[in-house]
Amino acid sequence: MNPDNFTHKTNEALVAAHEIASEAGHAQLTPLHLVAALAADKGGILRQAISQASGGDAGAPDSFERVVSGALKKLPSQSPPPDSVPASTALIKVIRRAQSAQKKRGDSHLAVDQLLLGLLEDSLISDCLKEAGVSAARVRAELEKLRGGEGRKVESASGDTNFQALKTYGRDLVEQAGKLDPVIGRDEEIRRVVRILSRRTKNNPVLIGEPGVGKTAVVEGLAQRIVRGDVPSNLLDVRLIALDMGALVAGAKYRGEFEERLKAVLKEVEEAEGKVILFIDEIHLVLGAGRTEGSMDAANLFKPMLARGQLRCIGATTLEEYRKYVEKDAAFERRFQQVFVAEPSVPDTISILRGLKEKYEGHHGVRIQDRALVVAAQLSARYIMGRHLPDKAIDLVDEACANVRVQLDSQPEEIDNLERKRIQLEVEHHALEKEKDKASKARLVEVKKELDDLRDKLQPLTMKYRKEKERIDEIRKLKQRREELQFTLQEAERRMDLARVADLKYGALQEIDVAIAKLESETGENLMLTETVGPEQIAEVVSRWTGIPVTRLGQNDKERLVGLADRLHQRVVGQAEAVSAVAEAVLRSRAGLGRPQQPTGSFLFLGPTGVGKTELAKALAEQLFDDENLLVRIDMSEYMEQHSVARLIGAPPGYVGHEEGGQLTEQVRRRPYSVILFDEVEKAHVAVFNTLLQVLDDGRLTDGQGRTVDFRNTVIIMTSNLGAEHLLAGMVGKNSMKVARDLVMQEVRRHFRPELLNRLDEIVIFDPLSHEQLRKVARLQMKDVAVRLAERGVALAVTDAALDVILSLSYDPVYGARPIRRWIEKRVVTQLSKMLIQEEIDENCTVYIDAAPHKDELAYRVDNRGGLVNAETGQKSDILIQVPNGAATGSDAAQAVKKMRIMEDEDGMDEE
């Protein structure tokens, strides 16, 4: 018995049997050990043969394995186990019988199937099969069928891995047609595939198209048509096998093993005489698959059979991979006929979604509204870039269904958030109880109040949730019961059991329908749980994927949008024209009436330095995203050379940094809903503006890697100082403001090309700030200082006289508002810093800033009795206290420190 004359599979089985015997402490290696090793191989031919011999019973191999394990336990064992485990006489006889069968077959190596035939003649193995309820004669017959009608020979050490190669390395799509999703449309593509398959030679279609357009679905549609008989007679009885290239390559550790597997597949296809069609998804993998030194790739094994028409093969690949791999091999390409699968239109996608609706409803246990399917197709086409219909629309529906299912099976988000907040406050409550300082005691009172309010809010919500959950669970149970009864009804109708049919149809089923209708009619308004997937759920998923707010506007959103201009004015002093232009553009976009193929708004802001051009862009980003840092800021002074355009859109192929993408395109691709600020735009090279033309016109830009970036949900703001000197001259009275504005526009038209200016929504000229407006700016800057002081528990009070001093010492009409900030930082913040370090200012005190007696300096006074938190009452004061020169008016800034952090009050600052 020379192991070199055994196949790899046989040797592996003998080694595994030896390990089983050693671990069990058995003195000899018996046929039982060998059968146990072969039965443990889940994909082995013994399990296949037993399953088929018992009429396709999947549990029969496991039953046999249990019987063999029981028999092994009865064998005598030694402890400690013996050093060597020799083969028993019975096993040697089995191998000799197998070798004699091998010689009759003409095999060069002893294969596993011959070894099994030898094992079946052993009485102990036959008894085990009988005990498991399997006929040994049938198992023998199934093993002999494995090699096919012609009795294929094993001529190499890996020859026995290729029995039933199609079953091992592929799956029959015709067999699985009932489990596949229904294919809607694609009739023209399926007909073209059928026509190509019916040719005499080169009868191999290749489906090419973008990822996600439904190439594989065309083949699944063909499989379903074959099952229905809706194909020409030459395709009626064919098997459509999807070849798994990964399984073919996986585990092929010996040279030539991959080619041997593939040849076995092709031989089975050839023997089927046209009754097998291969489907290879990602067919470009065939080119180069298995190629190593001294071996050929899979494509060269396919070519002869493809050309002669002996092999009918359907391929599928994307346009890019077809061009990259297949077109390079002209001999391989000419054997295939191209079938282009185009992206379906939105109406076609809606039809596809309607066809898939039942499958997704059944899987998730939810109900999908038809309007949700329409919205999924429309929103995915409009907002999700870089992917294709119907794939992205199907994914939207799937995720929306999954969200609803998860919400049904878990606590509503509202209750969950309140529970988390309650736990957080309880932890804070326990921590503050141990503190003795004034601020902690004041905060403790506040935490107790918040906890009481939270518990009052949480209790009714929890009760409502439990009631709704019970109702939905009851409806689901009734529906499952109805499905079971309908199945029983169909069975009774087939058996012609009319009494049972009448009993079910007019008794049990009617009762269940009445119960379901009653429970569904109990649904009130403002439900916490919903088992319906509607347009809102789809829009929510789109918003989560893209960051674009496409959800239906809530009451808070409506109030925010209507008051957007007022809230921008709280931060930007003056400039009513610019603020209203930006606010109106955002309003149009969020109402859904903006132009669909252009950015939300595109503006050119003109005016002298320090009047609020950049500040307005930051304020808009803060209002839209609650964070002014979510602003895509491009400083155009960095783009003064022609080659710097590549930094915006990404370096072209072959240049350093090609893989990194552009500074503008990458940020917008990640956050399509953003405010883009091109600062100091007149300083950029003219070539930069050429790239912006298509952004302003079509809302799209192609980056250095050929990807289209969507700018349709961005607000584009350009700022420039062109002609600022004319506006300043108009302000001091040398010209009228109208003449100054005309001069600015002339300057702009000289510098920028007409095609750029013509694409902008609005060119807004910012006026220089008046003395009164600069006072408001000074107050805003002092408010910023007050915020920093409030973090240390210090309140700040500033008189109007102090603001007048600040203005008189810092005002410069040429530079606008920026000198005020510089002066406050240099004088006021420096003085306050000195007072903090010298411990003149302490926690819970108020700093009063007033004009000094000689009017060109500021006077500072500290009151230790005030501060943010009154030590006696525990009440909080405003962080910036306005002290006018005349009678006291209301607070200028209704802002308070909450949890020792600054929380902006919604009312903001009262305008004078």
Swiss-Prot record:
Residues 6-75 are annotated as: Repeat 1. It holds the Pfam family AAA_2. Residues 87-149 are annotated as: Repeat 2. Induction: Expressed within five minutes of heat shock at 42 and 45 degrees Celsius in one week-old seedlings. Maximal level of expression after 30 minutes and decrease of expression after four hours at 45 degrees Celsius. No induction detected after salt stress, low temperature, desiccation, or abscisic acid (ABA) treatment. Protein expressed up to 72 hours in Indica rice and up to 96 hours in Japonica rice after a 2 hours heat shock at 42 degrees Celsius. Its main location: cytoplasm. The keyword Repeat applies. It comes from the Eukaryota. The keyword Transferase does not apply. ATP binds at residues 209-216, 607-614. Residues 406-502 form a coiled coil. This is Chaperone protein ClpB1. GO terms for cellular component: cytoplasm; cytosol; nucleus. Residues 3-149 form the Clp R domain. One of its GO terms (molecular function) is ATP binding. Belongs to the ClpA/ClpB family. It comes from Oryza sativa subsp. japonica (Rice). InterPro entries: AAA+_ATPase, ATPase_AAA_core, Clp_ATPase_C, Clp_N_dom_sf, Clp_R_dom, ClpA/B, ClpA/B_CS1, ClpA/B_CS2. Molecular chaperone involved in heat stress response. May play a role in resolubilization of protein aggregates after heat shock. Residues 533-724 are annotated as: II. It is found in: Cytoplasm, Cytosol; Nucleus. One of its GO terms (biological process) is cellular response to heat. The lineage of its organism: Eukaryota, Viridiplantae, Streptophyta, Embryophyta, Tracheophyta. Keywords: ATP-binding, Chaperone, Coiled coil, Cytoplasm, Nucleotide-binding, Nucleus, Repeat, Stress response. Residues 166-412 are annotated as: I.
